[in-house]
Amino acid sequence: MKTKLNKIANDTNIFLKKFLNKQNNSKLLPAMKYGLFPGGKKIRSKILIDIGSLLAIDYKTLIAIGAAVECIHAYSLIHDDLPCMDNDKIRRGKPSTHIKFGESTAVLAGNSLLTMAFEILASSSLQISEKIKINLIKRLSECSGHLGIAGGQYLDLSYEKKKISKNKIIEMEIKKTGKLFSFCCAAPAIIKKKNTKEIKFFENIGSDIGLLFQIADDLIDFKVSSKIAGKKTGKDQKKGKATLISLLGYMNAIQYCDKIILKTNKNLKRYGSNSKNIKETLNYILHRKK
């Protein structure tokens, strides 16, 4: 699993570095690169490639789309770490972007990575039809704004120190994390020109995977040391964050994750042994330490 993730991370970073090298030089590039590289585990890109391989989508096309997704993810982390948001000083084992470059530069670098994602999807390096590009851009923009990441982060902040129902926590976590995974699962189906029902099928799988990822992330915050995780842990409890762990308890949250994995594997049964990569990724998501 590590070898597969490392290859995807390496190929994605090569694509992003080449793309950035073609950009006109600007004072924001160092902060953008700092927030983007070396980057995380590229699990979103791995899910995209797992689903893409089920539908026989070209690997280079998937890497380009994954690079756009990683720009969105990096933007969201830079902004989440800001003092006005989660106020995290460490990210991926190094000082957060705003600690290194200052708050205003971090905000602008995050904004620039957000818009660069759409540049990538619109670029000639992505060998798909203009109609499909427009569809992907529309869907990725929805995942990133008030209907997705930004809206989910707003709810996350507003739910602190409040008693929130299970359904509302799930809605928040799907917006905050699940929407981007939904895009990763739906994009290959869109490229393959699948019908609306089939695209929705993959979107729903993505929502479930995103929820699994968020619960697993909360489990790391609950139990793993900051040194191993590469970020400050134990903060959710201190801030009174609304999570499924705080509502259901540690063991019940793990059981909930197991149910998501069983459901996803059942839904992908039609692809037989071809779905073994995604099964492996789901188990990795739940059992990772950072």
Which residues does each PLM region occupy?
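Mg2+-dependent prenyl diphosphate-binding active-site environment of isoprenoid biosynthetic enzymes
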Residues: 4, 11, 17-268, 276-286
